[in-house]
């Protein structure tokens, strides 16, 4: 059996909760062959792994979201081709941009077609006309040139994802929705394999929170970006055979974002019972008690309106993205 793990922005490039979980999971099944399809920003991190890869992880494929047209490993300047869509392809690409119901199979087939250039499509007349139609219907009160280039920026990483040649496997296990979920959904379309999605955090909500706080994107463009992530997650939920989350509240969020409830399994983080022996438990309780003693109120050191004298204990926190 061959399992393809699809990850974004984590394993094996950075240490963190999700990365550690992936590494442990692969090691826990030495009789299963794993391959890794990992999504990163650009080629600057190519092959820079911080984990020693397990022996049963046989191949690593990298997808770069901030990429350009490459041939035989080198960038070449070419005369731009006039790229035209079929009527069906144009209809579905319009539905994609307009946030309508999408026949994703047509989109998948379009980008896996031989000779399709992401640059030529984004800069071509069909995409221009689709964006202009969207602009006239929904965003006519903003500057068109800004809108056009923003839409090109939004769809560039998605189009690169859709052009990726997905390796064949028996099961695709995405550790998030987003671009990873798009790859998993496309793999299921072409290889007729099973698709499992395990969400440690709710990808769409995390991206939404980042965008709301971000300074690099303003006004209505925040909503356009948020809708982009929502439609990618909806695709993943629709195509997945099983979707897992860590707690009931996350399940409700997944349902709210369009995941069929019958697909969802709540799987809380496990506990290694070997570490919960009576001896270890007693030792842990003693440590907790000593820590509490540090913070206890010291007699004779209090005055009206003052705080108890305390030692400041700092904790190193690690944040794991997606």
Locate predicted features.
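Short N-terminal targeting/anchoring amphipathic segment
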Residues: 97, 163-181, 190-196, 200
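N-terminal subdomain of nucleotide-sugar transferases
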Residues: 1-131, 135
């Amino acid at each position: 059996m061959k399992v393809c793990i699809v990850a974004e922005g984590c394993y094996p490039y950075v240490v963190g909760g999700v990365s550690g979980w992936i590494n442990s999971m692969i090691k826990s099944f030495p009789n299963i062959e794993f391959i890794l399809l990992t999504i990163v920003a650009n080629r600057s991190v190519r092959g820079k792994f911080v984990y020693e890869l397990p022996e049963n992880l046989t191949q690593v494929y990298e997808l770069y979201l901030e990429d350009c047209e490459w041939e035989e490993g080198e960038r070449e300047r070419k005369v731009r081709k006039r790229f035209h869509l079929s009527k069906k392809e144009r209809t579905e690409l319009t539905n994609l941009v307009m946030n309508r119901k999408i026949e994703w199979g047509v989109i998948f087939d379009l980008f896996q077609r031989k000779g399709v250039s992401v640059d030529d499509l984004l800069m071509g007349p069909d995409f221009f006309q689709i964006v202009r139609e969207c602009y006239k219907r929904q965003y006519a009160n903003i500057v068109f040139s800004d809108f056009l280039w923003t839409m090109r920026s939004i769809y560039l990483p998605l189009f690169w994802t859709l052009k990726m040649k997905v390796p064949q496997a028996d099961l695709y296990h995405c550790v998030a929705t987003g671009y990873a979920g798009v790859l998993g959904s496309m793999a299921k379309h072409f290889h007729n394999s099973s698709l499992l999605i395990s969400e440690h955090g709710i990808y769409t909500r995390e991206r939404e929170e980042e965008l709301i706080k971000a300074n690099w994107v303003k006004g209505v463009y925040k909503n356009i970006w948020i809708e982009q992530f929502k439609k990618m997650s909806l695709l993943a939920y629709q195509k997945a055979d099983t979707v897992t989350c860590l707690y009931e509240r996350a399940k409700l969020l997944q349902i709210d974002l369009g995941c069929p409830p019958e697909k969802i399994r709540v799987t809380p983080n496990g506990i290694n019972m070997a570490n919960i022996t009576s001896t270890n438990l007693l030792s842990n309780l003693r440590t907790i008690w000593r820590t509490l003693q540090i913070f206890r109120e010291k007699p004779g050191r209090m005055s009206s309106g003052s705080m108890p004298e305390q030692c400041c204990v700092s904790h190193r926190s690690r944040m794991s993205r997606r």
